[in-house]
């Protein structure tokens, strides 16, 4: 189909299009997997999962891997037919209509911006503590947050391929240091030898396994922490316009990131439990959350590999957090770019640099992230606040919004294929798998809302109390804007979620026409 015209002013470098054909499969994988931040995910989410599931935390990662793989089945079918930087926003618009589509688009854009700020706070905390530990230079976390945001803005201006290479180098370092730790543990059998009990999903709900802080077990916390570790895997379609073969790469990158991360997470979480022992794994987590140790992973690395590996891990958690923040930054910029290109948000957001990167949207993200971080720094200027407030509270908002939109995407996939008149409707890929995906995402949302007080460590904080309502209000604002445009600006309303690449990247795949999904 021909791309719908964008309602935007242009400069000599503005095309309303991103640079096409510049990303291969490795580059897209780097952009996706760094969003999941494997090192940060393991150092933070494995202990959280252990709080709820005890030594069965590896089983929680197995359950999440299976659930997200099933969700990906229908998601990939949709991505093969809809190629746009809008990702979830475009999918919901095509499947459920423009009104819920814009609600999803605004919500997911807000969530990714919040994630960028949250992970920037995590990076600031670890940069400050690591620098103080290694050099004696004691600066507040916000100094490193400013440096990180400036660097992200600079990288965003350059070609996306350059950014992908930076992300790739940092990602490889994260994976290697965790694998070195795991090999060191497995080589000697850990503290008590090997056991299959941590890999049995039944034990997630077994009170005898949950010997952590909650005593009687909180399976919801264990499962939520596992799902949390994959946030970012869904980014592949957002880079579709910039890939050489969007239909093939979206499928391979999504499956590769979900299954690859799943196997990796299970290995590392199992190494953690094996290294400490079934009982010791929970005891170490208690020490971490009591503030006695910076991470339950550091003593393990010291014991089974050596202090040099621990120092390397401390450095890589800083660079890995930066890479994660940059990945979310890039994706949030692409959502704002897509919304600006279609005339929903100010058209200036669709302006690109001479390298065809979403320059205006990126600078907008920079400004929003800066203001959001500033609010938290004013609330709690301490270095610990960067982690315990900004870096812990904000991801709960981001994860809840993303899980809610993923649930909507599952329903959108089903309706899209049921109403499109296509012969490629399949009982498994476009019906049963999305239904299972919807159920999994809905359950994860309920678990987050029910356990948000324990997960944040600040059940009485206003931010935590109103968190579900913030997600709902943002979604409703997006829907209200779409409803307003439907009556006052039909031409702009018609563009919601309908932009697509002018030419299909795969000559054998017919590009989907605008179906005029109604809402």
Predicted ranges, named:
Residues 392, 396-405, 428-519:
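A generic transmembrane alpha-helix motif of multi-pass inner-membrane proteins
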Residues 142-200, 231, 253-260, 401-404, ...:
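Membrane-interface loop-to-helix entry segments
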Residues 14-21, 58, 136-140, 169-314:
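Helix-loop-helix junctions that connect adjacent transmembrane segments
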Residues 90-91, 97, 129-133, 253-326, ...:
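TM-loop-TM module centered on a large, flexible mid-protein loop between adjacent transmembrane helices
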Residues 84, 107-124, 230, 235-243, ...:
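Membrane-helix boundary/coupling elements in multi-pass transport proteins
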Residues 1-46, 51-56, 69, 73, ...:
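Membrane-interface "cap" regions at the ends of multi-pass membrane proteins
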Residues 41-141, 266, 466-479, 486:
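Extracellular loop-to-transmembrane helix junctions
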Residues 90-94, 99, 121-143, 172, ...:
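Helix-loop-helix connectors at the membrane interface of multi-pass transporters/channels
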């Amino acid at each position: 189909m021909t791309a719908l015209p964008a309602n935007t002013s242009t400069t000599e470098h503005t095309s309303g299009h991103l640079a096409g054909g510049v990303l291969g499969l490795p580059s897209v994988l780097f952009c996706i997997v760094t969003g999941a931040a494997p090192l940060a995910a393991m150092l933070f989410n494995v202990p959280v999962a252990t709080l709820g599931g005890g030594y069965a935390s590896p089983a929680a990662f197995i359950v999440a891997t299976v659930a997200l793989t099933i969700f990906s089945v229908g998601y990939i079918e949709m991505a093969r037919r809809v190629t746009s930087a809008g990702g979830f926003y475009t999918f919901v618009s095509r499947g459920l209509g423009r009104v819920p589509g814009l609600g999803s688009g605004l919500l997911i854009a807000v969530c990714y911006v919040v994630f960028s700020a949250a992970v920037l706070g995590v990076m600031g905390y670890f940069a400050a503590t690591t620098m103080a530990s290694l050099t004696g230079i004691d600066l507040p976390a916000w100094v490193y947050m400013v440096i990180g945001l400036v660097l992200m803005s600079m990288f965003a201006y350059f070609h996306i391929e350059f950014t992908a290479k930076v992300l790739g180098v940092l990602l490889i370092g994260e994976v290697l240091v965790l694998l070195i730790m795991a090999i060191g543990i497995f080589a000697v059998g850990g503290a008590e030898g090997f056991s299959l009990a941590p890999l049995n999903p039944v034990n997630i709900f077994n009170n005898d396994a949950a010997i952590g802080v909650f005593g009687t077990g909180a399976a919801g916390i264990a499962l939520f922490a596992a799902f949390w570790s994959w946030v970012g895997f869904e980014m592949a379609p957002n880079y579709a316009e910039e890939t050489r073969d969007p239909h093939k790469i979206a499928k391979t990158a999504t499956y590769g990131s979900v299954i690859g991360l799943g196997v990796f997470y299970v290995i590392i979480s199992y190494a953690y439990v094996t290294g400490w022992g079934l009982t010791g794994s929970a005891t170490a987590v208690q020490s971490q959350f009591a503030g006695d140790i910076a991470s339950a992973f550091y003593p393990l690395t010291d014991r089974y590999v050596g202090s040099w590996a621990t120092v390397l891990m401390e450095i890589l958690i800083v660079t890995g957090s930066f890479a994660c923040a940059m990945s979310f930054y890039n994706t949030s910029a692409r959502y704002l770019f897509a919304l600006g290109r279609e005339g929903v948000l100010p058209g200036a957001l669709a302006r690109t640099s001479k390298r065809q990167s979403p320059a205006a949207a990126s600078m907008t993200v920079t400004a929003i992230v800066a203001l959001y971080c500033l609010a938290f720094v004013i609330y709690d200027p301490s270095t610990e606040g960067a982690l315990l407030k900004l870096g812990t509270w904000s991801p709960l908002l981001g994860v809840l919004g993303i899980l809610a939109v993923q649930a909507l995407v599952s329903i959108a996939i089903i309706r899209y294929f049921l109403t499109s008149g296509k012969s490629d409707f399949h009982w498994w890929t476009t019906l049963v798998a999305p239904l299972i995906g919807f159920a999994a995402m809905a359950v994860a949302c309920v678990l987050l809302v029910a356990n948000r007080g324990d997960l944040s460590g600040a059940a009485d904080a206003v931010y935590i109390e109103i968190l579900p309502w913030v997600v709902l209000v943002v979604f409703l604002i997006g829907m209200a804007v779409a409803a307003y445009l439907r009556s006052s600006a039909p031409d702009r309303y018609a563009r919601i979620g309908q932009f697509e690449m002018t030419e299909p990247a795969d000559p054998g795949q017919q590009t989907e026409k605008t179906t005029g999904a109604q809402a």
